Amino acid sequence: MLYPLIRKGIFALEPETAHNLAIKALHIAGNPWLNRALKALLGCPQGTEKTVMGIKFKNPIGLAAGADKNGEAIDGFGAMGFGFIEVGTVTPLAQDGNAKPRQFRIVEAEGIINRNGFNNYGIDHLIENVNKSHYDGTLGINIGKNKITPIEQGKDDYIFCLNKAYNYAHYITVNISSPNTPDLRTLQYGDALDDLLKSIKERQKILAEQYNKYVPIALKIAPDLTEAELVQIADTVRRHQMDGVIATNTTISRDTVQGMKNAAEIGGLSGKPLQHKSTEIIRRLHRELKGDIPIIGSGGIDGVQNAQEKIAAGAELLQIYSGLIYHGPALVKTLVQTIK
Protein backbone atom coordinates (compact mmCIF):
# COMPACT_ATOMS: atom_id res chain seq x y z
CA MET A 1 0.00 0.00 0.00
CA LEU A 2 2.87 2.36 0.78
CA TYR A 3 4.82 1.48 -2.35
CA PRO A 4 3.14 3.99 -4.74
CA LEU A 5 4.42 6.77 -2.45
CA ILE A 6 7.87 5.20 -2.18
CA ARG A 7 7.98 4.74 -5.95
CA LYS A 8 7.33 8.45 -6.45
CA GLY A 9 10.47 9.21 -4.45
CA ILE A 10 12.48 6.51 -6.22
CA PHE A 11 11.41 7.74 -9.66
CA ALA A 12 12.46 11.29 -8.80
CA LEU A 13 16.05 9.99 -8.80
CA GLU A 14 18.24 8.81 -11.66
CA PRO A 15 17.60 5.05 -12.13
CA GLU A 16 21.11 3.96 -11.14
CA THR A 17 21.18 6.27 -8.10
CA ALA A 18 17.82 4.86 -7.01
CA HIS A 19 19.07 1.32 -7.53
CA ASN A 20 22.23 1.90 -5.48
CA LEU A 21 20.20 3.43 -2.62
CA ALA A 22 17.81 0.46 -2.69
CA ILE A 23 20.74 -1.97 -2.49
CA LYS A 24 22.20 -0.04 0.47
CA ALA A 25 18.83 -0.08 2.26
CA LEU A 26 18.36 -3.80 1.61
CA HIS A 27 21.92 -4.45 2.77
CA ILE A 28 21.07 -2.74 6.08
CA ALA A 29 17.87 -4.84 6.18
CA GLY A 30 20.17 -7.87 6.33
CA ASN A 31 20.65 -7.11 10.03
CA PRO A 32 18.93 -10.07 11.78
CA TRP A 33 16.56 -7.91 13.86
CA LEU A 34 15.62 -5.66 10.93
CA ASN A 35 15.28 -8.70 8.69
CA ARG A 36 12.73 -10.30 11.00
CA ALA A 37 10.84 -7.00 11.19
CA LEU A 38 10.81 -6.63 7.39
CA LYS A 39 9.58 -10.21 6.94
CA ALA A 40 6.76 -9.55 9.41
CA LEU A 41 5.87 -6.25 7.72
CA LEU A 42 5.74 -7.72 4.21
CA GLY A 43 4.03 -10.91 5.38
CA CYS A 44 4.92 -13.08 2.41
CA PRO A 45 3.86 -16.72 2.87
CA GLN A 46 6.24 -19.64 2.34
CA GLY A 47 4.53 -20.63 -0.91
CA THR A 48 4.43 -23.96 -2.70
CA GLU A 49 7.57 -26.11 -2.83
CA LYS A 50 8.78 -27.19 -6.25
CA THR A 51 11.67 -29.46 -7.25
CA VAL A 52 13.47 -28.33 -10.41
CA MET A 53 17.01 -29.23 -11.61
CA GLY A 54 17.12 -31.63 -8.66
CA ILE A 55 16.80 -28.71 -6.21
CA LYS A 56 13.90 -28.21 -3.82
CA PHE A 57 12.78 -24.57 -4.19
CA LYS A 58 10.60 -23.28 -1.32
CA ASN A 59 8.46 -21.53 -3.95
CA PRO A 60 8.79 -20.96 -7.72
CA ILE A 61 9.26 -17.15 -7.62
CA GLY A 62 12.82 -15.87 -7.92
CA LEU A 63 14.77 -12.63 -8.19
CA ALA A 64 16.47 -12.32 -11.58
CA ALA A 65 20.18 -11.59 -11.97
CA GLY A 66 21.10 -7.92 -12.33
CA ALA A 67 19.26 -6.75 -9.23
CA ASP A 68 22.03 -7.72 -6.79
CA LYS A 69 25.18 -7.96 -8.88
CA ASN A 70 27.58 -8.25 -5.95
CA GLY A 71 25.46 -10.18 -3.45
CA GLU A 72 25.24 -7.18 -1.12
CA ALA A 73 21.52 -7.45 -0.32
CA ILE A 74 20.75 -11.18 -0.37
CA ASP A 75 19.08 -11.23 3.06
CA GLY A 76 17.14 -8.02 2.38
CA PHE A 77 15.71 -9.43 -0.85
CA GLY A 78 15.16 -12.74 0.95
CA ALA A 79 12.83 -11.02 3.43
CA MET A 80 10.48 -10.23 0.53
CA GLY A 81 9.69 -13.94 0.25
CA PHE A 82 11.57 -15.03 -2.87
CA GLY A 83 11.95 -18.79 -3.22
CA PHE A 84 15.28 -18.23 -4.94
CA ILE A 85 17.68 -15.38 -5.59
CA GLU A 86 20.15 -15.17 -8.46
CA VAL A 87 23.09 -12.85 -7.81
CA GLY A 88 25.43 -11.44 -10.46
CA THR A 89 26.22 -11.22 -13.29
CA VAL A 90 29.75 -11.50 -11.94
CA THR A 91 33.04 -11.65 -13.85
CA PRO A 92 36.53 -12.92 -12.90
CA LEU A 93 37.88 -9.39 -12.36
CA ALA A 94 36.11 -6.29 -11.07
CA GLN A 95 35.05 -3.94 -13.86
CA ASP A 96 33.31 -0.56 -14.06
CA GLY A 97 30.98 -1.40 -16.91
CA ASN A 98 29.92 1.10 -19.55
CA ALA A 99 29.88 4.89 -19.24
CA LYS A 100 27.05 6.55 -17.30
CA PRO A 101 24.20 7.28 -17.67
CA ARG A 102 23.44 3.68 -18.58
CA GLN A 103 19.96 3.03 -17.14
CA PHE A 104 16.76 4.59 -18.45
CA ARG A 105 13.11 4.21 -17.51
CA ILE A 106 10.34 4.04 -20.08
CA VAL A 107 7.68 4.85 -17.52
CA GLU A 108 4.62 4.85 -19.79
CA ALA A 109 5.40 1.26 -20.86
CA GLU A 110 6.75 0.10 -17.47
CA GLY A 111 10.04 -0.70 -19.16
CA ILE A 112 13.72 -0.18 -18.39
CA ILE A 113 16.68 0.06 -20.75
CA ASN A 114 20.14 -0.69 -19.40
CA ARG A 115 23.57 -0.80 -20.97
CA ASN A 116 25.41 -1.51 -17.71
CA GLY A 117 28.03 -3.82 -19.20
CA PHE A 118 28.49 -6.26 -16.30
CA ASN A 119 29.61 -3.65 -13.74
CA ASN A 120 30.63 -5.66 -10.66
CA TYR A 121 33.33 -6.07 -8.01
CA GLY A 122 34.53 -9.47 -9.22
CA ILE A 123 33.82 -13.07 -8.25
CA ASP A 124 35.93 -13.08 -5.05
CA HIS A 125 33.98 -10.15 -3.59
CA LEU A 126 30.68 -11.81 -4.48
CA ILE A 127 31.67 -15.10 -2.81
CA GLU A 128 32.60 -13.20 0.38
CA ASN A 129 29.11 -11.69 0.46
CA VAL A 130 27.42 -15.02 -0.28
CA ASN A 131 29.33 -16.51 2.67
CA LYS A 132 28.01 -13.81 5.00
CA SER A 133 24.36 -14.21 4.02
CA HIS A 134 21.76 -16.14 6.04
CA TYR A 135 19.16 -16.52 3.30
CA ASP A 136 17.27 -19.81 3.66
CA GLY A 137 16.15 -20.12 0.03
CA THR A 138 17.95 -21.30 -3.10
CA LEU A 139 20.89 -19.19 -4.28
CA GLY A 140 22.02 -18.99 -7.90
CA ILE A 141 25.20 -17.32 -9.13
CA ASN A 142 25.14 -15.81 -12.62
CA ILE A 143 28.55 -15.71 -14.34
CA GLY A 144 29.87 -13.75 -17.32
CA LYS A 145 33.07 -12.70 -19.03
CA ASN A 146 35.18 -9.58 -18.60
CA LYS A 147 34.99 -6.99 -21.36
CA ILE A 148 38.79 -7.04 -21.80
CA THR A 149 38.80 -10.80 -22.43
CA PRO A 150 38.80 -11.51 -26.20
CA ILE A 151 35.66 -13.40 -27.20
CA GLU A 152 37.84 -16.29 -28.43
CA GLN A 153 39.06 -16.73 -24.84
CA GLY A 154 35.66 -16.04 -23.24
CA LYS A 155 35.36 -19.70 -22.27
CA ASP A 156 38.30 -19.27 -19.85
CA ASP A 157 36.40 -16.58 -17.91
CA TYR A 158 33.36 -18.82 -17.50
CA ILE A 159 35.50 -21.74 -16.31
CA PHE A 160 37.34 -19.42 -13.88
CA CYS A 161 34.04 -18.22 -12.37
CA LEU A 162 32.61 -21.75 -12.35
CA ASN A 163 35.59 -22.98 -10.32
CA LYS A 164 35.14 -20.14 -7.80
CA ALA A 165 31.34 -20.28 -7.51
CA TYR A 166 30.74 -24.03 -7.56
CA ASN A 167 30.97 -24.70 -3.83
CA TYR A 168 28.87 -21.66 -2.86
CA ALA A 169 25.88 -21.85 -5.23
CA HIS A 170 22.83 -24.10 -5.37
CA TYR A 171 22.91 -23.56 -9.14
CA ILE A 172 25.02 -21.54 -11.59
CA THR A 173 23.84 -19.60 -14.64
CA VAL A 174 26.02 -19.05 -17.69
CA ASN A 175 25.09 -15.66 -19.12
CA ILE A 176 25.93 -15.42 -22.82
CA SER A 177 22.97 -13.25 -23.75
CA SER A 178 23.58 -9.73 -22.43
CA PRO A 179 23.53 -7.25 -25.33
CA ASN A 180 25.89 -4.90 -23.48
CA THR A 181 29.21 -6.76 -23.73
CA PRO A 182 30.63 -6.64 -27.28
CA ASP A 183 30.22 -9.93 -29.21
CA LEU A 184 28.96 -11.82 -26.13
CA ARG A 185 25.82 -13.02 -27.89
CA THR A 186 27.93 -14.72 -30.58
CA LEU A 187 28.60 -17.42 -27.97
CA GLN A 188 24.95 -18.50 -28.38
CA TYR A 189 25.54 -19.89 -31.85
CA GLY A 190 27.02 -22.90 -33.62
CA ASP A 191 30.50 -24.17 -32.76
CA ALA A 192 31.09 -21.39 -30.20
CA LEU A 193 28.15 -22.58 -28.06
CA ASP A 194 29.05 -26.23 -28.59
CA ASP A 195 32.63 -25.63 -27.48
CA LEU A 196 31.59 -23.53 -24.46
CA LEU A 197 29.02 -26.02 -23.16
CA LYS A 198 31.37 -28.97 -23.72
CA SER A 199 34.04 -27.28 -21.58
CA ILE A 200 31.55 -26.25 -18.90
CA LYS A 201 30.07 -29.76 -18.59
CA GLU A 202 33.56 -31.30 -18.42
CA ARG A 203 34.52 -28.88 -15.65
CA GLN A 204 31.22 -29.50 -13.83
CA LYS A 205 32.01 -33.23 -13.74
CA ILE A 206 35.46 -32.58 -12.24
CA LEU A 207 34.04 -30.15 -9.65
CA ALA A 208 31.23 -32.56 -8.71
CA GLU A 209 33.86 -35.18 -7.87
CA GLN A 210 36.06 -32.65 -6.07
CA TYR A 211 33.27 -31.33 -3.82
CA ASN A 212 31.21 -34.51 -3.74
CA LYS A 213 28.07 -32.68 -4.85
CA TYR A 214 26.33 -31.90 -8.13
CA VAL A 215 25.58 -28.22 -8.77
CA PRO A 216 23.24 -27.72 -11.75
CA ILE A 217 24.18 -25.28 -14.51
CA ALA A 218 21.63 -23.27 -16.52
CA LEU A 219 22.12 -21.27 -19.72
CA LYS A 220 20.56 -17.81 -20.04
CA ILE A 221 19.44 -16.97 -23.57
CA ALA A 222 18.32 -13.86 -25.45
CA PRO A 223 14.79 -13.17 -26.70
CA ASP A 224 16.09 -11.96 -30.07
CA LEU A 225 16.51 -15.38 -31.69
CA THR A 226 15.27 -16.65 -35.02
CA GLU A 227 13.45 -19.97 -35.19
CA ALA A 228 16.56 -21.63 -36.65
CA GLU A 229 18.80 -20.20 -33.91
CA LEU A 230 16.43 -21.36 -31.18
CA VAL A 231 16.23 -24.87 -32.66
CA GLN A 232 20.03 -25.02 -32.76
CA ILE A 233 20.37 -23.80 -29.15
CA ALA A 234 17.79 -26.35 -27.99
CA ASP A 235 19.65 -29.12 -29.80
CA THR A 236 22.99 -28.06 -28.28
CA VAL A 237 21.72 -27.80 -24.68
CA ARG A 238 20.05 -31.22 -24.99
CA ARG A 239 23.18 -32.78 -26.44
CA HIS A 240 25.31 -31.46 -23.59
CA GLN A 241 22.63 -32.28 -21.01
CA MET A 242 22.46 -28.80 -19.52
CA ASP A 243 20.41 -28.66 -16.34
CA GLY A 244 18.21 -25.69 -17.22
CA VAL A 245 17.60 -22.74 -19.54
CA ILE A 246 16.64 -19.23 -18.42
CA ALA A 247 14.45 -17.53 -21.00
CA THR A 248 15.01 -14.69 -21.44
CA ASN A 249 17.46 -11.86 -21.04
CA THR A 250 16.69 -8.29 -22.21
CA THR A 251 15.79 -7.44 -25.82
CA ILE A 252 17.46 -5.11 -28.31
CA SER A 253 14.11 -4.73 -30.13
CA ARG A 254 12.13 -1.50 -29.67
CA ASP A 255 8.92 -2.61 -31.44
CA THR A 256 6.81 -2.24 -28.30
CA VAL A 257 8.11 1.18 -27.20
CA GLN A 258 8.60 3.14 -30.44
CA GLY A 259 8.28 6.90 -30.02
CA MET A 260 8.34 6.79 -26.22
CA LYS A 261 10.75 8.81 -24.08
CA ASN A 262 14.18 7.08 -23.79
CA ALA A 263 13.16 4.35 -26.27
CA ALA A 264 16.02 5.26 -28.61
CA GLU A 265 18.67 4.63 -25.94
CA ILE A 266 21.07 1.77 -26.73
CA GLY A 267 20.93 -1.27 -24.46
CA GLY A 268 18.73 -4.12 -23.36
CA LEU A 269 15.03 -3.47 -22.79
CA SER A 270 13.31 -5.22 -19.88
CA GLY A 271 9.96 -5.00 -18.13
CA LYS A 272 6.45 -5.08 -19.54
CA PRO A 273 7.50 -4.44 -23.18
CA LEU A 274 9.42 -7.77 -23.08
CA GLN A 275 6.47 -9.74 -21.70
CA HIS A 276 5.05 -11.38 -24.83
CA LYS A 277 8.38 -11.80 -26.61
CA SER A 278 9.88 -13.77 -23.71
CA THR A 279 6.74 -15.90 -23.30
CA GLU A 280 6.84 -16.78 -27.00
CA ILE A 281 10.49 -17.87 -26.70
CA ILE A 282 9.54 -20.04 -23.70
CA ARG A 283 6.72 -21.63 -25.70
CA ARG A 284 8.94 -22.37 -28.71
CA LEU A 285 11.84 -23.57 -26.55
CA HIS A 286 9.56 -25.88 -24.55
CA ARG A 287 8.33 -27.40 -27.80
CA GLU A 288 11.93 -28.08 -28.89
CA LEU A 289 13.16 -29.38 -25.51
CA LYS A 290 10.09 -31.65 -25.11
CA GLY A 291 10.22 -31.26 -21.34
CA ASP A 292 13.72 -32.81 -21.12
CA ILE A 293 15.32 -29.66 -19.70
CA PRO A 294 13.48 -27.28 -17.33
CA ILE A 295 12.89 -23.66 -18.32
CA ILE A 296 13.05 -20.72 -15.92
CA GLY A 297 10.86 -17.94 -17.28
CA SER A 298 11.89 -14.31 -17.02
CA GLY A 299 10.86 -11.15 -18.82
CA GLY A 300 8.11 -8.65 -18.07
CA ILE A 301 6.29 -10.48 -15.29
CA ASP A 302 4.17 -7.88 -13.48
CA GLY A 303 1.15 -9.85 -12.28
CA VAL A 304 -0.55 -13.20 -11.88
CA GLN A 305 -1.98 -13.40 -15.40
CA ASN A 306 1.28 -13.07 -17.32
CA ALA A 307 3.09 -15.20 -14.73
CA GLN A 308 0.58 -17.97 -15.40
CA GLU A 309 1.02 -17.44 -19.16
CA LYS A 310 4.71 -18.23 -18.78
CA ILE A 311 3.93 -21.35 -16.72
CA ALA A 312 1.40 -22.44 -19.37
CA ALA A 313 4.04 -21.83 -22.08
CA GLY A 314 6.40 -24.26 -20.34
CA ALA A 315 8.29 -22.44 -17.56
CA GLU A 316 8.71 -24.32 -14.28
CA LEU A 317 10.12 -21.42 -12.27
CA LEU A 318 9.79 -17.65 -12.72
CA GLN A 319 12.08 -14.67 -12.12
CA ILE A 320 11.21 -11.00 -11.71
CA TYR A 321 13.18 -7.77 -11.50
CA SER A 322 11.73 -4.83 -13.48
CA GLY A 323 8.24 -5.70 -12.19
CA LEU A 324 9.58 -5.34 -8.65
CA ILE A 325 10.74 -1.79 -9.45
CA TYR A 326 7.35 -0.78 -10.85
CA HIS A 327 5.10 -2.68 -8.41
CA GLY A 328 7.12 -3.22 -5.24
CA PRO A 329 7.37 -6.20 -2.85
CA ALA A 330 3.58 -6.78 -2.96
CA LEU A 331 4.16 -8.34 -6.39
CA VAL A 332 6.36 -11.03 -4.81
CA LYS A 333 3.69 -11.80 -2.21
CA THR A 334 0.91 -12.01 -4.82
CA LEU A 335 2.93 -14.34 -7.05
CA VAL A 336 4.09 -16.56 -4.18
CA GLN A 337 0.49 -16.90 -2.96
CA THR A 338 -0.86 -17.74 -6.42
CA ILE A 339 1.74 -19.57 -8.52
CA LYS A 340 2.09 -23.28 -7.79
UniProtKB/Swiss-Prot annotation:
Record EC number: 1.3.5.2
Binding residues for FMN: 65-69, 89, 142, 175, 220, 248, 271, 300, 321-322
GO biological process: 'de novo' pyrimidine nucleobase biosynthetic process; 'de novo' UMP biosynthetic process
Keywords: Cell membrane, Flavoprotein, FMN, Membrane, Oxidoreductase, Pyrimidine biosynthesis
Amino acids binding substrate: 69, 114-118, 175, 180, 249-250
GO cellular component: cytoplasm; plasma membrane
Record PANTHER family: DIHYDROOROTATE DEHYDROGENASE (QUINONE), MITOCHONDRIAL (PTHR48109:SF4), DIHYDROOROTATE DEHYDROGENASE (QUINONE), MITOCHONDRIAL-RELATED (PTHR48109)
Family: Belongs to the dihydroorotate dehydrogenase family. Type 2 subfamily.
Protein name stated in the entry: Dihydroorotate dehydrogenase (quinone)
Organism, scientific name: Actinobacillus succinogenes (strain ATCC 55618 / DSM 22257 / CCUG 43843 / 130Z)
Gene of this entry: pyrD
